Amino acid sequence: MRFLVSVAFLLTVSSLLVSGENNNPVPEDPCSKEGGVCVAVDRCPDEYKKPGLCPKQKARGIDCCAIAPRDTCASRGGECTTLDCGRMEQKDVNHDCPPGTKCCVWV
């Protein structure tokens, strides 16, 4: 009986984690490099859609959406940091990060 309760609990937790994934899209390189962000497709106006640039999340209804002209690090899914982020650095962003930091999009 204890085993069945444990299995039921694990299945419930797993289903909650999976169902919450659509609420938390993550940046993907192809989309970020095109100046977009990965979002639920129903949240992006047609004229801003950039299909196929969030391939890892496509099955969950997530795709690339061009961002508004506001060009900030956070609007591209980035974070201002002093860490070395290699190819994840957004060099083409005219970002708002403080001096001595760079905009990195962690994938």
From Swiss-Prot:
Give the organism, scientific name.
Scolopendra morsitans (Tanzanian blue ringleg centipede)
Tissue and organ distribution: Expressed by the venom gland.
How is it modified post-translationally?
A: Contains 6 disulfide bonds.
Q: Which InterPro entries match?
A: Myo_ane_neurotoxin_sf (IPR023355)
Q: Write the protein's name.
A: U-scoloptoxin(19)-Sm1a
Q: Name one GO molecular function term.
A: toxin activity
Where does the secretion signal sit in this chain?
Answer: 1-20
The family this protein is said to belong to: Belongs to the scoloptoxin-19 family.
Q: Which GO terms describe its cellular component?
A: extracellular region
Is Signal a UniProt keyword of this protein?
yes
Q: Which UniProt keywords apply?
A: Disulfide bond, Secreted, Signal, Toxin
Location relative to the cell? Secreted
